[in-house]
């Protein structure tokens, strides 16, 4: 049975209560307050729903993750990185990145980044929890992504690309930055061919929970101002 959250409690049900069909649906309801969002990621779940639906909280099994030392950079991507065609920065325009991620896409109906969700993650950015990666070409924003940094874990949320391989350049730059800062895992949530080509793979929900338990409260040395 699906658990419905109330606004006066930040407690989530155990991850083992998540449904098998649809895979990983853990709870519904509640709100997107900064406190609840932080608690959700610490617990191992994330919000994902369409505009007009109640807030839905997910913890899929398996979970798609990328370990920084398993990053795969193809020869063509490595060549592109060496060419320096794109300029990559961190936290220089979080609102523009999340707006670009929320923009309609040819292959999708609507967007799951609602105005309420946008405002919630912008508040997390103001609190120093959510971060953005900007990829520019000749000063124009052509790619990027955003997510949350907590302890030695980074929780990726969404990315976009308006130029060939722009999001891949941003992602690879982020992974290398996180690795240097002591991060041990990047949560990619759901599988995509795009992420698998970069080295992401599936681990069990239980294994993911172990990483949360051991690394959420460990310090990192990441600097987010470019």
UniProtKB/Swiss-Prot annotation:
Provide GO CC annotations from the record. cytoplasm
Enzyme Commission no = 2.3.2.6
Q: What is its main location?
A: cytoplasm
* GO MF term (any one): leucyl-tRNA--protein transferase activity
Q: Which reaction does it catalyse?
A: N-terminal L-lysyl-[protein] + L-leucyl-tRNA(Leu) = N-terminal L-leucyl-L-lysyl-[protein] + tRNA(Leu) + H(+); N-terminal L-arginyl-[protein] + L-leucyl-tRNA(Leu) = N-terminal L-leucyl-L-arginyl-[protein] + tRNA(Leu) + H(+); L-phenylalanyl-tRNA(Phe) + an N-terminal L-alpha-aminoacyl-[protein] = an N-terminal L-phenylalanyl-L-alpha-aminoacyl-[protein] + tRNA(Phe)
Which positions carry the signal peptide feature in this UniProt record? Answer: none
Q: Which InterPro entries match?
A: Acyl_CoA_acyltransferase, Leu/Phe-tRNA_Trfase, Leu/Phe-tRNA_Trfase_C, Leu/Phe-tRNA_Trfase_N
Q: Where in the cell is it found?
A: Cytoplasm
Matching Pfam families: Leu_Phe_trans
UniProt similarity note: Belongs to the L/F-transferase family.
Task: Give the protein's biological function.
Answer: Functions in the N-end rule pathway of protein degradation where it conjugates Leu, Phe and, less efficiently, Met from aminoacyl-tRNAs to the N-termini of proteins containing an N-terminal arginine or lysine.
Q: What is this protein called?
A: Leucyl/phenylalanyl-tRNA--protein transferase
Which organism's genome codes for this protein? Answer: Pseudomonas putida (strain W619)
């Amino acid at each position: 049975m699906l658990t419905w959250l109330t606004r006066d409690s930040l407690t989530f049900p155990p991850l083992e209560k998540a449904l098998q069909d649809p895979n990983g649906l853990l709870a519904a309801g509640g709100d997107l307050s900064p406190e609840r969002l932080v608690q959700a990621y610490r617990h191992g779940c994330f919000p994902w729903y369409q505009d007009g639906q109640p807030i839905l909280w997910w913890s899929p099994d398996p979970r798609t993750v990328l370990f920084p030392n398993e990053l795969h950079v193809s020869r063509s991507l490595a060549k592109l990185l060496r060419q320096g065609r794109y300029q990559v920065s961190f936290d220089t325009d979080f609102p523009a990145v999340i707006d670009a991620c929320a923009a309609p896409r040819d292959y999708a109906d609507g967007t799951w980044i609602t105005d309420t969700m946008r405002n919630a993650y912008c508040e997390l950015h103001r609190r120093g929890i959510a971060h953005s990666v900007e990829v520019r070409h000749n000063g124009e924003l052509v790619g990027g992504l955003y997510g949350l940094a907590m302890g030695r874990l980074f929780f990726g949320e969404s990315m976009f690309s308006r130029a060939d391989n722009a999001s891949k350049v941003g992602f690879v730059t982020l992974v290398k930055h996180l690795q240097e800062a002591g991060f041990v895992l990047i949560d990619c949530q759901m599988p995509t061919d795009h992420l698998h080509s970069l080295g992401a793979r599936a681990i069990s929900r239980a294994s993911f929970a172990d990483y949360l338990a051991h690394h959420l409260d460990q310090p990192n040395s990441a600097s987010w101002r470019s």
